[in-house]
Amino acid sequence: MKEVYFIIPEFDKSITGGTLYDNNLVLELKKLRIPIKEVRVRYNINVILLHKKINKIPKSSTILIDGYLVNKLRTRVINRLNILIHHPCSMEISNNQMSNINLYLSERKAFNAAESLITVSKTMKRVLQKYLGKYKNICVAYPGIDKKFCKQEIDRYSKNILSVGNVIPRKGYHILIEALKKVTEDWTLTIVGNHEMDKTYYDNLKRLIIKNEMQDRIEFKGSMKPNEIVAEIKKSKFFILLTKYEGFGMSIAECAAAGLEIITTDLPVLREVLGNYPVDFVDLRDPDNISNKINEKLSRNSVNGKNKDIFYTWSDTAKKIKRFYEKRIFY
């Protein structure tokens, strides 16, 4: 069985959906006796250092690299190269991959050079196919939902709204604050997620909150452990995330599995992931409708969330990847 070297970016104190996926995948592949070795690098590693790391990996082994890093690949990798893509970096700011042409071209080159790709949803698979010049094997392996999130008791009398996601423009917190201006019901908002990733954006949000006199209503909790997030779920009425783009939407899926009702953006991937959960899909261009949806949920002393069984575990994720790659990279 070939050794697999998994190159993983680390984001200091930030916990991203991609980080959770990578870490859980490593744990579960090891349980399946896959000889996987971790190569952890800083998220902002430069091109030269990344290639030095790669050059130290035995040429007979296989490389699995997180797609966040592949735009830094400048020369051909001798090893068999496989890429795990949560979503392309060229779509981080806009859902038009051509908005950053240089980033798009570097990712396109890397995706096409890879032996195969792994991604997290069928929607993302269709997105990646647009980057490819020819057919390529793409494995879709949904993220697992940690059991601790499932089947929670929700406080139907709560007036607290929960939002989970790092404080970056793509998550749409500025849109949420604007929508809350027109909410007439009593409310508070808890935001869970690292607010040091984009200090300019965070400072702008704080100014917007002060301008609208919402300081006593909105609390930024920073990054939290899963058990701490579960505690926030139990204290909240519903979940909202007005995200502009997602590869999967792990925090949304976790809160839906817990039993919270959901308000989120009408994106194809979120319709795929959330299935039959009670979700209000909204158009970010219609803030009045968003305000109305928030008012509607706050005014009811009931919760329509469904406590569904986990549809995918991290063990399932690893087994799916193992089956896909058994004759490709592990042997």
Specify the residue positions occupied by each region the protein language model found.
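Conserved acidic donor-binding segment of nucleotide-sugar-dependent glycosyltransferases
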Residues: 279-288, 295-299
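Glycosyltransferase donor-sugar binding loop
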Residues: 188-206, 222-223
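Carbohydrate-associated surface elements
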Residues: 123, 144
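Aromatic "clamp/platform" in nucleotide-sugar-dependent glycosyltransferases that forms part
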Residues: 244
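A conserved mid-protein helix/loop that constitutes part of the nucleotide-sugar donor-binding site
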Residues: 20, 159, 166-182, 200-203
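Short hydrophobic beta-strand element within catalytic cores of glycosyltransferases
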Residues: 261-264
